[in-house]
C-alpha cells in the first residue's frame, strides 16, 4: 500500500502543504476547526507517522542517551527500568551504553550517541569528569555521581548512612563495620562513609571501615566479599556485629555467606544495605536497607533533562546560568536483618 504523503493530505483537505506541515510541527498556529479537519483526513487516508522523515526535517531525533556503569549492581538495573518507564510520560526513546573505567571507550560511546542526534544525555558512570561532559554542549543530567559542571540528582547519602548507623548503635552492636569501595570525596556516595565514621565517633562506639571491595564483575565482587566475611569472622568472634554495606547487592552476597555457614542469620549479626533495589526484598531473608527513592530520582532526572531539551528547541534558547542540583531524601526500610 502506497504511503500517504503531505501532498495527499493537502489534496484531500484542500489546504496547502505548508498548512499540513504546520499541523504536525506547530498545531497551535491553526484554528481548532482546521486541526479537526486535518485529523479526520489522517484517519480516513490511513496516515502513518514517518519518524525518520521528521528527524531529517527538523533535526530532532526524540532520542536520549544513557551511560550506565553496569547491570550486575541491582541499583543500576532498577534505575534503568525506571528511566525507561518514563516513555509513557515524555515519549522519548533511549539509546543505552554500559561503560566502566575506560575513559576513551566512554568518549567513543558519547560520539556514537551524538551521531544519532540525541537530544539529551543521562550519565550514571563515573569515568569522565563533569567538566569533560559539559564540553559536549547538549543537555546533560548526572545521577549519583560527581556533577560540579552539569545538573544532577542525588540521594542525601549522609542522612541515609546516619539512619543506618544509628539503628545499629540502638540495636547494641558491639562493633560496627562499613563495607564499601574507596570512593572519591567528590562523589555523593562518599557521604555514606563520612556519616558512618562521624556517627560512630560521636556515639563513641568501636567501628571498622573496609574500603577494599573492588571488581568489574559479579564474581570478582563476590570473591572480595567472601574474603571480607572471613576476616570479620576471625577478627571479631563472640561480638555482635553490625554490618552496613554500600549497596543491596553487597548486602545480599554477605547475607548468603552467613547462611552458607550458619544456615540462619545468627543473633550476633545485623545487616543493612543501601538502595532498596529489588534484591533487598527478594533475598533469602528480606534485608533492612536505606531506600533510595529510585522512582523519584529517575522522574526528577527526566524532568530536569526535558526542561533543558525543551528550552533548546526555542528560537532564542536561554541555557541554564548554572547547573541545577536536586537531592532526594532516603527512607530507612526495616526488614528481617536487624532487630
Describe these PLM feature segments.
Residues 1-5, 43-81, 90, 115:
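N-terminal helix-turn-helix/winged-helix DNA-binding helices
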Residues 124-163, 183, 249, 275-287:
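Flexible loop/hinge segments that line or gate small-molecule binding clefts
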Residues 1-15:
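Extreme N-terminal segment that seeds HTH/winged-HTH DNA-binding domains in transcriptional regulators
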Residues 230-242, 246-339:
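Flexible loop/turn connectors
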Residues 164-211, 317-337:
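An alpha-beta-alpha
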Residues 153-178, 194-198, 220-230, 251, ...:
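Hydrophobic alpha-helical segments within soluble ligand-binding/sensing domains
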Residues 85-130:
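Central regulatory/effector-binding core of bacterial HTH transcription factors
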Residues 87-98, 197-222:
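Short beta-strand elements in bilobed, periplasmic/extracellular small-molecule ligand-binding domains
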Amino acid at each position: 500500500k502506497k504511503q500517504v504523503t503531505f501532498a495527499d493530505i493537502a489534496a484531500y483537505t484542500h489546504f496547502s502543504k505548508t498548512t499540513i506541515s504546520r499541523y504536525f510541527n506547530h498545531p497551535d498556529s491553526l484554528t481548532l476547526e482546521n486541526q479537526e479537519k486535518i485529523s479526520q483526513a489522517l484517519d480516513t487516508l490511513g496516515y502513518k507517522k514517518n519518524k525518520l522523515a521528521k528527524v531529517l526535517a527538523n533535526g530532532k531525533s526524540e532520542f536520549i542517551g544513557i551511560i550506565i556503569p553496569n547491570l550486575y549492581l541491582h541499583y543500576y538495573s532498577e534505575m534503568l527500568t525506571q528511566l525507561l518507564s518514563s516513555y509513557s510520560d515524555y515519549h522519548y526513546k533511549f539509546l543505552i551504553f554500559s561503560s566502566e573505567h575506560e575513559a576513551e571507550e566512554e568518549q567513543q560511546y558519547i560520539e556514537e550517541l551524538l551521531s544519532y542526534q540525541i537530544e539529551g544525555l543521562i550519565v550514571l558512570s563515573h569515568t569522565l569528569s563533569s567538566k569533560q561532559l559539559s564540553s559536549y554542549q547538549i543537555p546533560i543530567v548526572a545521577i549519583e555521581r560527581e556533577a560540579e559542571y552539569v545538573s544532577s540528582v542525588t540521594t542525601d547519602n549522609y542522612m541515609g548512612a546516619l539512619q543506618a548507623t544509628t539503628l545499629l548503635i540502638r540495636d547494641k552492636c558491639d562493633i560496627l563495620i562499613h563495607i564499601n569501595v574507596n570512593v572519591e570525596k567528590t562523589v555523593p556516595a562518599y557521604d555514606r562513609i563520612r556519616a558512618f565514621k562521624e556517627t560512630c565517633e560521636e556515639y563513641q562506639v568501636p567501628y571498622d571501615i573496609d574500603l577494599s571491595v573492588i571488581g568489574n564483575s559479579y564474581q570478582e565482587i563476590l570473591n572480595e566479599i567472601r574474603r571480607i566475611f572471613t576476616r570479620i569472622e576471625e577478627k571479631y568472634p563472640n561480638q555482635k556485629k553490625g554490618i552496613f554495606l554500600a549497596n543491596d547487592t553487597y548486602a545480599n552476597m554477605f547475607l548468603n555467606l552467613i547462611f552458607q555457614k550458619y544456615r540462619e542469620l545468627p543473633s550476633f549479626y545485623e545487616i543493612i544495605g543501601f538502595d532498596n533495589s529489588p534484591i533487598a526484598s527478594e533475598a533469602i531473608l528480606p534485608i533492612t536497607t536505606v531506600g533510595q527513592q529510585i522512582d523519584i530520582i529517575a522522574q526528577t532526572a527526566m524532568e530536569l533533562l526535558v526542561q533543558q531539551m525543551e528550552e533548546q528547541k526555542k528560537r532564542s534558547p536561554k541555557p541554564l546560568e548554572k547547573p541545577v542540583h536536586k537531592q532526594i531524601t532516603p527512607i530507612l526500610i526495616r526488614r528481617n536483618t536487624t532487630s
